[in-house]
Amino acid sequence: MDKKTARMRRARKSRGRIRDVGAYRLSVHRTPRHIYAQVQQPDGATTLAAASTVEPALRQRSEGTGNVSAAQEVGRLIAERAKAAGIEQVAFDRGGYQYHGRVQALAEAAREAGLKF
């Protein structure tokens, strides 16, 4: 089993558990250059809030897009947008990635900005 297949298998298991709980899902996707976050409905059909380092406003504020400080900015921004959409409580879907580095920085920044998970 290659690295991507193993990550997708881990992600599928956690997404199934989140779907059973019926909570809004804060999902994270990362690439070497960018990090993306979105809040989805429990069934995964609709995205209610999204933020990423691809956005021009975030690109100008941070020194790079593939680092921990950029992930923290995305975490703060996704929390603000989720709260504006009326969402306070979410389940964190790390997408099969380790809870370390940029994924951890995004999660902690979202918690500090008032999102509960």
Curated annotation (Swiss-Prot):
Claim: Ribonucleoprotein is one of the keywords in the record:
yes
Molecular function in Gene Ontology: 5S rRNA binding; structural constituent of ribosome
Q: Does the keyword Lyase apply?
A: no
What is one GO biological process annotated to this record? translation
Pfam families found in the cross-reference section:
Ribosomal_L18p
Looking up InterPro entries in the UniProt record yields: Ribosomal_uL18_bac-type (IPR004389), Ribosomal_uL18_bac/euk (IPR005484)
This protein's GO cellular component annotations are: cytosolic large ribosomal subunit
Q: Which UniProt keywords apply?
A: Ribonucleoprotein, Ribosomal protein, RNA-binding, rRNA-binding
Output the CDD domains linked to this UniProt entry. Ribosomal_L18_L5e (cd00432)
Where are its TM segments located?
none
Q: Report quaternary structure and partners.
A: Part of the 50S ribosomal subunit; part of the 5S rRNA/L5/L18/L25 subcomplex. Contacts the 5S and 23S rRNAs.
The family note in this entry says: Belongs to the universal ribosomal protein uL18 family.
* Described purpose of this protein according to its UniProt entry: This is one of the proteins that bind and probably mediate the attachment of the 5S RNA into the large ribosomal subunit, where it forms part of the central protuberance.
- Protein name as it appears in the record: Large ribosomal subunit protein uL18
**Originating organism:** Halorhodospira halophila (strain DSM 244 / SL1) (Ectothiorhodospira halophila (strain DSM 244 / SL1))
Designated gene of the protein: rplR
